[in-house]
Amino acid sequence: MTVLIHVLGSDIPHHNRTVLRFFNDALAATSEHAREFMVVGKDDGLSDSCPALSVQFFPGKKSLAEAVIAKAKANRQQRFFFHGQFNPKLWLALLSGGIKSRQFFWHIWGADLYELSSGLIYKLFYPLRRLAQKRVGCVFATRGDLSFFAKTHPKVRGELLYFPTRMDPSLNTLANDRQREGKMTILVGNSGDRSNEHVAALRAVHQQFGDTVKVVVPMGYPPNNEAYIEEVRQAGLELFSEENLQVLSEKLEFDAYLALLRQCDLGYFIFARQQGIGTLCLLIQAGIPCVLNRENPFWQDMTEQHLPVLFTTDDLNEDIVREAQRQLASVDKNTIAFFSPNYLQGWQRALAIAAGEVA
């Protein structure tokens, strides 16, 4: 049998590293279909840290896409599992038949599903991508993204799958003993990426709570983002006093980020699509409720797991936040489907489907 090849088609270092390490640590030992990767980006020690994997690195999207297409044409039995994607040439290859539907399996990461960019080149490309998506052999995604995708592509098979967020299950009960009182701390956004709409989010928080809360804005990732960070900082200072605004410009290591999240009382995410599932998982694990945009379909996954959801359109105050915290504390977090290690079963099934081992 031809071994499944996994494709990380865009240079997104943080996400790519997370996926590679997850496969190395949790999947490669038990499945031959979890070991072969083609990745856009630099090695940067990944080969050494993932010895169970065979990883081929490419300098850019174009070179990777050309290599994938060549493999697909040379052997029509070869199957590919595309994680995320963000690679126009691969979509065009699927549309034109360079890659066949039976070869193309896609794990949706959120951004590659939605059509939120206003640039002309994106608006021209989106209809083509939409046509190509009708030809995907099977999509894997969150419950909300599956629902969103099915509205335009009802005939494409969909399977539930969650991004492998790095989590320590032993921390699931840690938050229950913590007493929350005094001035609330609100986390705004999950990174420094503009998709977080930081300025609009800060204004929304201020409209709800005024200058009575402390706001923390993590913006250490992606790098080389100084101008936008300063723009957000200045906008924040127009709304909040200096002691109530903390804009973080340095990238935090995982343990430091975890400690930061656990000092918060609420997460506030204004973006109108599914993203930031890693941060959401870590907040929920710590007993911290989240405010979502109603257009973010991940609320469907949260309600399915009996988790409280607050929306940006709700009238929020401290009492409502504290009640959501109380409800979250009563949830058995060891049963949440998108938590580690529960999402592992979905990955094992996804591998079997993509490799053709199960129908």
Curated annotation (Swiss-Prot):
Pfam families: Glyco_transf_56. It catalyses: beta-D-ManNAcA-(1->4)-alpha-D-GlcNAc-di-trans,octa-cis-undecaprenyl diphosphate + dTDP-4-acetamido-4,6-dideoxy-alpha-D-galactose = alpha-D-FucNAc4-(1->4)-beta-D-ManNAcA-(1->4)-D-GlcNAc-undecaprenyl diphosphate + dTDP + H(+). GO terms for biological process: enterobacterial common antigen biosynthetic process; fucosylation. Transmembrane segments: none annotated. It is found in: Cell inner membrane. GO terms for cellular component: plasma membrane. Keywords: Cell inner membrane, Cell membrane, Glycosyltransferase, Membrane, Transferase. The keyword Cell inner membrane applies. Its EC number is 2.4.1.325. It is a peripheral membrane protein. Its main location: membrane. InterPro entries: WecF. Pathway: Bacterial outer membrane biogenesis; enterobacterial common antigen biosynthesis. The keyword Nucleus does not apply. One of its GO terms (molecular function) is fucosyltransferase activity. Belongs to the glycosyltransferase 56 family. NCBIfam families: PRK02797.1-1, PRK02797.1-2, PRK02797.1-3. HAMAP family: WecF_RffT (MF_01002). Catalyzes the synthesis of Und-PP-GlcNAc-ManNAcA-Fuc4NAc (Lipid III), the third lipid-linked intermediate involved in ECA synthesis. This is TDP-N-acetylfucosamine:lipid II N-acetylfucosaminyltransferase. The lineage of its organism: Bacteria, Pseudomonadati, Pseudomonadota, Gammaproteobacteria, Enterobacterales.
